[in-house]
Amino acid sequence: MTPRTLEPAGGAQTARIGDMLTLTGTEARHAVTVRRLQVGERVDLVDGAGLRLVCEVVRAGANGARDRLTARVRERVEEAESTVRMVLVQALAKSGRDEQAVETATELGVDAVVPWQAERCVSVWRGAKVAKGRARWQATAREATKQARRAWVPEVGELLTTRSLTRWVRETTQTGGVVLVLHEEAAAPIGGVRLPDPDDCE
C-alpha cells in the first residue's frame, strides 16, 4: 500500500531513527478518522523543505483520542531540491480556477507559484485580500504536496502586476532561464521546446 503523507509535529527537524513523534489536532484527526491509519502502517512525515521521516504508526486514536497519532521514526531522508526549478506564473481567476491550477501544478512537480494580477482579470486582490489570497494558495499547495507525496512544498511568491511580471521574465531569461507562455492560440506544442540540460543549471 502507498504510504500516507502528513505534516509532522514539532521536533521533526531533530528527530532521529527510533524517536517517537506525536501528531495532534486536525492533521491527526484526519489521519485517524478519515484515512483510518492503523497501528503498524507506514506513514511519511514531510516538513515541506525536503525532510521526509519514514515512520510506523504505533498508536492511532487510542482511548478515544481521535485527534492524536503517534509514530516511530524508521528512516530519515533529506530529499534534494530539483536541479531545474519550475515556476508557475498563474493569473488570478474567478470560481477557484486559479487554485485548481495551483493544485494541479503542485501535483505535477512545480517548485514555486507566482500570482499575477493581469490587467483584464475579473478577480482582483487588493489590500487585505493580497495576504488572504496568498495564504489560500499556499494552503492549496501544501495539501496538494501531501496528496502527491512530495517532500517539498512550492512557495507562493509576491503578487505581480503585468509590469513587474515583464521585468521578472526579462531577468529570468537574461540569467539563462526559459519562459514558456501557455496560450490557447499557440502554434508550437510545449513538447517541442528545448529545455536546459540539468547539468548546465548547477
Q: What spans do the regions from the language model cover?
A:
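Active-site/ligand-binding-proximal alpha/beta "capping" segment
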Residues: 176-202
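N-terminal positively charged helical leader segments and presequences
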Residues: 1-78
